[in-house]
């Protein structure tokens, strides 16, 4: 029996008036650092100011103070998000054709931006249908608004104003919880309470309130919209909420109220909580009744999950106990000590969250097209392509961020003296085996995946198609993927007897959903071409992981530099006296990892874009004949490198290259400009600091001659700064180029 001393009933969890609000201090650049606060001597000062402004670890070593700054900054972030959302809704209310789109979503394109004629750029206002001229948008907001039950621009105005009020509230909260009532460290470390509140509150009640909104507002309004009722004739949301008889006309079970719920006769509610699977043939989106059911189920799960952890009542799980019990036969002390790491190192915590959120974002990308959740989303090809591309890039960046913060944790927060034989220590002790094996896997994947393409290019060049790897010659069918597809396609009659159709049309079966003569979704065939490109995916992902993991595992020490931890997270080289020690810092691994992340995601979005245009997207005739945008050329063209260059990059770039003089010309200019930004990055990546310092000193000499030399001494960028500027422009230029290429193409042909 464990006897615990009685704890005081009320814990004081905040400090009052912790730090005074001082505009004078905020107005002094670099007030958070003694060195920076002195002001600039050289131009390096402005770079250090940006690098360290949010590096709270460098301001103080007091964990409580760091925690408060991070917490306060989160409210600032939320404020910006609300401001951004407000802007999106305001554009929908003020500058868009939302009401026209709502009345005819198959013939009218979504637009929420009208360009003002200043120097003739009103050419950008294309005809999106219904007599409206503006820029076609591909964010998916219109489809989201329709699914939420928004029927007028006035409702968008009200939401925009509401979001502005919330933005102001968040700004106030950020100030209040740092200056007026700052939480104590114990509050940030009370993980059980945090889990309960986040699970039950954010996820549980959040899902429940969304399910409630869907049932009482979205479902009835969408029911009317689908039946072709004029949006102006549809009752307003509060009428559905307050008048049960109105809902009962659409969903008879509403007449019975809550009786079926308390008598456990839940199947009565199956008229608005369904389990159908597949897509609604009217809108090409998931059944909104399925979505409502899903959110209700999720809410129940998370409300239960939010009552599992031990807080004031002495029952439930303790996270420390769970982690310390977590050990297997070959894992030594297992997760012992992990609780302390995750409650004292916010970098470790953030790393874990970024890895999870990044993976989840990529999962979202894949579900948005295979199970399109909003009405008329699946037939808006530009939006589909944009949503996939956007979520893939974001996921890639978040995963690299996970490695970055894992490495910062290793350098700044990891204490090797207190860790022995737990899982992390054991991983670090056999890091050589991990990295060398991973390196072997990368070499194997690289040579074999690329080798298959090179073989095909060679055979194609020699005029020997019968010797190529293709669906019509030597087949390399992705049999495991096809088996998984088939299993899911057959699920409704086997493992999921309650469902009418399988979760996604992409699995297989004969179903095709078309809306307004355009294909929403159909079974996606996988063949040799997909087998080849999937191994390129495997290769690029493994190389990215190799670089990032090496950075984390060797962040503190390596055979080359045993005292690396003393040099910090980012440093250019191990001092001037040691050659061959550049690009070894943990920061440099993140820098290099970003390039491979860019490679990996580029191949994924290229694969997706071409595959969908070739095998899914297109029009359907009255006889039911489908004509795809690129006529199914993916299977035979994408099996050679030449095919990718000729039939994808070059053939599909014609729209962006020929966009001048049309409403798509902005994409042509972006395509050009973003190429320029990308090329500009190479100047930073391929030249050293000394070259620029020499040039600068010559320019300073000229300024002195003319007596216009500045007081602040100009300096070349440091090595690390140059790399940071380089990789930023490389990624920005590359992503913007791809964006212009994709959108000009898909808006023109989609």
Curated annotation (Swiss-Prot):
InterPro entries: PSI_PsaA, PSI_PsaA/B, PSI_PsaA/B_CS, PSI_PsaA/B_sf. GO terms for cellular component: chloroplast thylakoid membrane; photosystem I. Chlorophyll a binds at residues 683, 691. It is a multi-pass membrane protein. [4Fe-4S] cluster binds at residues 573, 582. GO terms for molecular function: 4 iron, 4 sulfur cluster binding; chlorophyll binding; electron transfer activity; magnesium ion binding; oxidoreductase activity. One of its GO terms (biological process) is photosynthesis. Keywords: 4Fe-4S, Chlorophyll, Chloroplast, Chromophore, Electron transport, Iron, Iron-sulfur, Magnesium, Membrane, Metal-binding, Oxidoreductase, Photosynthesis, Photosystem I, Plastid, Thylakoid, Transmembrane, Transmembrane helix, Transport. The PsaA/B heterodimer binds the P700 chlorophyll special pair and subsequent electron acceptors. PSI consists of a core antenna complex that captures photons, and an electron transfer chain that converts photonic excitation into a charge separation. The eukaryotic PSI reaction center is composed of at least 11 subunits. PANTHER family: OUTER MEMBRANE PROTEIN, OMPA-RELATED (PTHR30128), PHOTOSYSTEM I P700 CHLOROPHYLL A APOPROTEIN A1-RELATED (PTHR30128:SF19). This is Photosystem I P700 chlorophyll a apoprotein A1. It comes from Daucus carota (Wild carrot). The lineage of its organism: Eukaryota, Viridiplantae, Streptophyta, Embryophyta, Tracheophyta. The gene is psaA.
């Amino acid at each position: 029996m464990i006897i615990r001393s009685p704890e005081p009933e009320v814990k004081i969890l905040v400090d009052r008036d912790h730090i005074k609000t001082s505009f004078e201090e905020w107005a002094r650049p670099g007030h958070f650092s003694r060195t920076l606060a002195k002001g600039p001597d050289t131009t390096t000062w402005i770079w250090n100011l940006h690098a360290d402004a949010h590096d709270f670890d460098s301001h103080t070593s007091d964990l409580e103070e760091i925690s408060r700054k991070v917490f306060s900054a989160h409210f600032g972030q939320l404020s910006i998000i609300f401001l951004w959302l407000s802007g999106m809704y305001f554009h929908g209310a003020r500058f868009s054709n939302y009401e026209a789109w709502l009345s005819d979503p198959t013939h009218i394109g979504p637009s929420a931006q009208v360009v003002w004629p200043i120097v003739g750029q009103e050419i950008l206002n294309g005809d999106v249908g219904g007599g409206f001229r503006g820029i076609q948008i591909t964010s998916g907001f219109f489809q989201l608004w329709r699914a939420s039950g928004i029927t007028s621009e006035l409702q968008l105005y009200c939401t925009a104003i509401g979001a502005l009020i919330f933005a102001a509230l968040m700004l106030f909260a950020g100030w209040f919880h740092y200056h007026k009532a700052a939480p104590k460290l114990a509050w940030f470390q009370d993980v059980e309470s945090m889990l309960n509140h986040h699970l039950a509150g954010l996820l549980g009640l959040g899902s429940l309130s969304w399910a409630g909104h869907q049932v009482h507002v979205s479902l009835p309004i969408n029911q009317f919209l689908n039946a072709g009722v004029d949006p102006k004739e549809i009752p307003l949301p509060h009428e559905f909420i307050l008048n049960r008889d109105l809902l009962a006309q659409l969903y008879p079970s509403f007449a019975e109220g809550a009786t079926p719920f308390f008598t456990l006769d839940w199947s009565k509610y199956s008229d608005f909580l369904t389990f159908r699977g597949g897509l609604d043939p009217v809108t090409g989106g998931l059944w909104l009744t399925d979505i409502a059911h899903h959110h209700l189920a999720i809410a129940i799960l998370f409300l239960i999950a939010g009552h599992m952890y031990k807080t004031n009542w002495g029952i439930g799980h303790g996270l420390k106990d769970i982690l310390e019990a977590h050990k297997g036969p070959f894992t030594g002390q297992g997760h012992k000590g992990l609780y302390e790491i995750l409650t004292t190192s916010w970098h470790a915590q953030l790393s874990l969250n970024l890895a999870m959120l990044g993976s989840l974002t990529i999962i979202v990308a894949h579900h948005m097209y295979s199970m399109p959740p909003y009405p008329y989303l699946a037939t808006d090809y530009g939006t589909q392509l944009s949503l996939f591309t956007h979520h893939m890039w974001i996921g890639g960046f978040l995963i690299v961020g996970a490695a970055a913060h894992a490495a910062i944790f290793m350098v700044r927060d990891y204490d090797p003296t207190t860790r022995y034989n737990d899982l992390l220590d054991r991983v670090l002790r056999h890091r050589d085996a991990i990295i060398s094996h991973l390196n072997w896997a990368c070499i194997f994947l690289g040579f074999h995946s690329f080798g298959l393409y090179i073989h095909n290019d060679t055979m194609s060049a020699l005029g020997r198609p019968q010797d190529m790897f293709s669906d019509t010659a030597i087949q390399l069918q992705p049999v495991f993927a096809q088996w998984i597809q088939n299993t899911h396609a057959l699920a409704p009659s086997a493992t999921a007897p309650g469902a009418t159709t399988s979760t996604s049309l992409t699995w297989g079966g004969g179903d095709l959903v078309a809306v307004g003569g355009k294909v929403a979704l159909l079974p996606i065939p996988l063949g040799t071409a997909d087998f080849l490109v999937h191994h390129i995916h495997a290769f690029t992902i493994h190389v990215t992981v190799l670089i990032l993991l090496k950075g984390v595992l060797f962040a503190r020490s390596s055979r080359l530099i045993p005292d690396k931890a003393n040099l910090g997270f980012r440093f250019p080289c191990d001092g001037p006296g040691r050659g061959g020690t550049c690009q070894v810092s943990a920061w440099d691994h993140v820098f290099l990892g970003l390039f491979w992340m860019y490679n990996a995601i580029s191949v994924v979005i290229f694969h997706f874009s071409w595959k969908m245009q070739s095998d899914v997207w297109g029009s359907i005739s009255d006889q039911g004949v489908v004509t795809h945008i690129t006529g199914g050329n993916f299977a035979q063209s994408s099996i050679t490198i030449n095919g990718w260059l000729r039939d994808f990059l070059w053939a599909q770039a014609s729209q962006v290259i020929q966009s001048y003089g049309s409403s798509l010309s902005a994409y042509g200019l972006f395509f050009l400009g973003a190429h320029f930004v990308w090329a500009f990055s190479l100047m930073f990546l391929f030249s050293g600091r000394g070259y620029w310092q020499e040039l600068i000193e010559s320019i300073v000499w000229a300024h002195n001659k003319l007596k216009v030399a500045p007081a602040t001494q100009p300096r070349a960028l440091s090595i690390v700064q140059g790399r940071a500027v380089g990789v930023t422009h490389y990624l920005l230029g590359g992503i913007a180029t791809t964006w212009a290429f994709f959108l000009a193409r898909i808006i023109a042909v989609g």
